[in-house]
C-alpha cells in the first residue's frame, strides 16, 4: 500500500485535458495510486451552468456531478503519468442516485475507488458528498484510449 498524496491544480492541469468551463476538479486532497482518491470542487455562484439551471433556484446539474466524479476517477488512473496521446472516455454508468441538491457555496467532496482495471477499461465506485451527506453515488466505467484510435 502506498502513502497517500495530494495533487494541486497545476498537476491536475497536466493530467486532465479538461479546461474551463469543463474542468470540475479543483484539488485532490488524497490519493493512494491504483486504489482510492478524494478530490474537491468548490461550487460557486459564478459557475456558467447556474444561469440556466435554475435561475430562481440554482442547482448543480446531476450530469455535471457525474462528470466531476469521472474526472476524479481519471485522476486516479492518470495519477502517476498520462501518456501524451491518451484520452479518457466515459463508457458507462450503473446505479446512479442523486440524494441531495448541490447548491452555490457548497464544497463537493468526491471519492472514487478503483474496483477493476484491465486492458484500459476501469470500473469505479464513486460518491459525492456535501457537508458529510451523500449528494450522489454511482458505479462508472471508463476507457483509456489513444486519441487516434
Swiss-Prot record:
Active site: 53
Gene3D superfamilies according to UniProt: Hotdog Thioesterase
Signal peptide: none
MF (Gene Ontology): (3R)-hydroxyacyl-[acyl-carrier-protein] dehydratase activity
GO cellular component: cytoplasm; membrane
HAMAP family: FabZ (MF_00406)
Protein name as catalogued: 3-hydroxyacyl-[acyl-carrier-protein] dehydratase FabZ
Species annotation: Polynucleobacter asymbioticus (strain DSM 18221 / CIP 109841 / QLW-P1DMWA-1)
Native organism taxonomy: Bacteria, Pseudomonadati, Pseudomonadota, Betaproteobacteria, Burkholderiales
